[in-house]
Amino acid sequence: MKRLMLLGTAVAVGLALSAAPTLAQRKITLNVITAGDQNMVDYVKDYLAPQFEKDHPDVTVKAVGTGPGDAGSQKIYEKLVAEKSNAEWDIDVAVIHQKAAGLMVNEQLLAAYVKDVSTGKFVSSAAASNSLGTDVKGYVIPMFNSQTAIAYNSDMVKQVPGTYDDLVKWVDANPNKFGYNGIKGGMSGVSFVVGWIYAYAPDADKLMKGPYDAGVKNSWDPAFAKLKDFNKKVVLTPGNAGTLDMLGRGEIAMGPVWVDMFYTWQADGKLPPSVKLKLIGPGMPGQPMYYVVPAKAANAKVAEQFIELATSPKVQAEGIVKKFNWYPGIDATAVKAQLDEATWNKLFVDVTPQDLSTKGKSFPIAPYFNDIQEGYEKKVQ
């Protein structure tokens, strides 16, 4: 309501004064809401916002985080649903996970903005068209792509597991030295659980590609039973950052992490050089996060300009790859041209392009994804 009153006042002043400022000179607060860990908020607030505000002195970027994992994106979804009947919505730009993107597109909560931004031509990934089985083409641009892997302290782990089977044997011999966050507090634990189901349940390919068959989940009981037994010998950490923190302090020797967070923590001195990465077979999921514009964003055009900056090859190179250690969200060839070879190659020290090609998986289509998370809560926790 406050936004509408402010807009009304601005219009009234414009009518009253023949030499009034243009709409472009009106002071605007661009509300950018992001799910994910604190590094997501830091990226918007400390990196993107100053650049955008420098080129748009009439705009103040306000960055707010809603928390890690799908729960963070769910809060954004609930906010949009609550405002659905309003003429304008408070959120101008949102950064969300795949699961929420499909839901929001299906419920007509997002604008099909990609055709209207100049950087739309750099959108090339399959995940920009299909999000866990839902057609999202035209509604999303990936902010980045990321991957989970197993981080391990090479001073403590001499025989590094190469597969889930190897990991189970290692944990049997080294109880309470592996840690993960279950399915709470972040997606690194969720990814580990999904990778477990891919390893020990039949037909992982069907889970990723569909079609959905509600009866398939009944075939996962042995995999969940095996995971429940596994969990008796591991440490449950507080979340994505919690796993990294325990690795850094030597409280655990191994655990699943996001590759980007791992490299950032290591660059900041919070992880010793002895901690390294291994993408184990048969594979673990990664995912993008998406820039979206809500269907009734109050500042939709400014939101599009903000996303154009954020998805430009220069910003993707300097911010996404060099500063925050993500894989680029737009076409990698456009980004690589902006970087020196050493910076580009740093992304692939432990997890190679070949690893990503053979063991980097997608998350399941949404209904199977829901079934896995519900199955974990009922049969593992």
List PLM regions with ranges.
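Early extracytoplasmic/lumenal segment of secretory-pathway proteins
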Residues: 26-98, 102
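A ligand-binding cleft/hinge motif common to bilobed small-molecule-binding domains
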Residues: 101-103, 256-273
